[in-house]
Amino acid sequence: MFNQHFDVVVVGAGHAGCEAAHAAATLGCRTLLSTQVIDSIGQMSCNPAIGGIGKGHLVKELDALGGVMGIVADQSGIQFKKLNQRKGPAVHGSRAQIDKMAYRKNMKKILDACANLEIKQAEVVELIIKNSCVVGVKTDWNEVYSCGAIVIATGTFLDGLIHIGERKFPSGRLGDKESHPLAVNIKSLGLKISRFKTGTPPRLDGRTVNIEKLNRQDGDAIPSPFSFMHDKIERPEMPCWIAQTSKETKQIIEKNIHRSAMYSGQIEGVGPRYCPSIEDKIKKFKEREVHQVFLEPEGENTNEMYVNGVSTSMPIDVQWQMIRSIVGLENAQIVKPGYAIEYDMVMPTELDHTLKTKKYDGLYLAGQINGTTGYEEAAAQGMIAGLNAARFAKKESSYRFERYDGYFGVMVDDLVTRGVDEPYRMFTSRSELRIVHREDNADMRLTPLGHELGLVGHKRWEKYLSKKKQYDLLEDLSQKFKINGQPVSEILKRTDCDLEKVCEAMQLDALSKNVLEIYKNDLIYSGYEKKIIAENSRVEKYRSHVLPKEIDWSKVASLSSEVRLRLEKSDCRTVADVIATKGVTPASVVNILIYLGLK
């Protein structure tokens, strides 16, 4: 019956699928990565960028554990920026503009070189399950492969439906067919399924953009790599450009809002809160006359530009009017239309903390199928699912990431315990221990774990050991070395500490300076860590506390508009109910306790 046997089969070669396949193969499993189109491996279907606040943390943690997204981003980046630098290092976020074609090429090169991994261009149309355990898959070529575990990483392809104004048609991504047979098969499994939607803006011919009317945006003078395997970035940079919509843009959208698939009632799926369409912005922020737009190059060898901030499901004739009403885009040519896409997703409460379905052994889900949005969230889930699929296939115990491990654990716990009612995006505010879970120390926190799990290779482990040795030496030296009679360890705790002068006095090289900066941040945050642990203990103490019958959530200080809205719609009777409410962050719970006078 079976053509071949694989230990692990990964369905879909987007960001989740690539990491899942790489992790499983690294752990010694014979792994099949199945994709409709081999040339689309690692495709960046929407924005040509990786990272951001919270998202960059996921990429750093993924890299520290032996993942590949950070390495490929460094190889393919055309502009690098560290976001939030005016704030503390705990919330600094790495972000890079990416050459989309280079990213695909570099990702495929890594996967092609990965031992134990086979890539096939075939659409999986059926999961073969016996006695509530996966045993194989069937492809559109009528080939049947037996396997020990399966990772489903289908992105927006499960019964994907594209909307451009009044027009709608089945598609997994513009130009690619949807996965209908597998969607039907998964529906038959009895899992709780819903529909989400996402959107993307038009792409322009950059040669038709008048950059003289736009503001140039460059990256950091000294780019910071994503991967701890890289000490510096050696790639040419490309600028982005900042524009603004106009009053005319607003008028065009208001006049044609009934033709938007989002507002005509044509779309039923729920979209991402933090990536609204331009129609949403005009409707929800009526007082604003203009909105900022970023023009981002899609690569070195293409003229295409991504219009960040103008995601839309308007018909194509309205898209032309909208684009040409933006200053600098009066003569712009659209080369690809913007669109919205609806797709099937499985409620993540159907999963356990290893991303295995509770109903079926050996069946793991990763990425947008779990209700998340973003390349980074997908990639992190891919590693978790691939790791555990491999361990299941080898009859080893599963590994569960906990919230205290980092953003990996925070994301999975949020998904499987709270579920989602809109696409989930990572933010630093979701972590109780965000001052500990920093980007700069991700390797110090997680590379030993990755090594223990078998995900970290020899070169990465040797690099970690060298860095750890240097950290320990600098920690000891900073306690003994004095500047103006004061130990360096005390100077580093001061907010006005000039790290450059300290390094100069200690005669440290650039690499040692980076390690000293990590130690400095550890020192600064050590006191805050104790405070947060105390706050978490207080939250646990008052979990069963009954709330007053009527609370005016608008009077609780420092709650975001999302948290207020969710609490107003909920029927929370205890502190535990507040904690369990989707979208309520740990900091919000602490603020509520303060408001209630619970010390």
Curated annotation (Swiss-Prot):
The region annotated as signal peptide is: none
GO terms (molecular function) for this protein are:
flavin adenine dinucleotide binding
| GO biological process assignments | tRNA methylation; tRNA wobble uridine modification
- Please tell me where FAD binds in this chain: 12-17, 124, 179, 368
Please identify the protein, giving its name as recorded. tRNA uridine 5-carboxymethylaminomethyl modification enzyme MnmG
Pfam families found in the cross-reference section:
GIDA, SAM_GIDA_C
What does the organism's lineage look like at the top? Bacteria, Pseudomonadati, Pseudomonadota, Alphaproteobacteria, Magnetococcales
The GO cellular component terms are: cytosol
Query: What broad class describes the main subcellular location of this protein?
Result: cytoplasm
- Chain positions recorded as NAD(+) binding sites: 271-285
Name the SMART domains on file: GIDA_assoc_3
Localization (cell): Cytoplasm
By its UniProt entry, which InterPro entries does this protein fall under? FAD/NAD-bd_sf (IPR036188), MnmG (IPR004416), MnmG-rel (IPR002218), MnmG-rel_CS (IPR020595), MnmG_C (IPR026904), MnmG_C_subdom (IPR047001), MnmG_C_subdom_sf (IPR044920), MnmG_N (IPR040131)
Q: How does it assemble?
A: Homodimer. Heterotetramer of two MnmE and two MnmG subunits.
Q: What cofactor is needed? A: FAD
What keywords sit in the KW lines?
Answer: Cytoplasm, FAD, Flavoprotein, NAD, tRNA processing
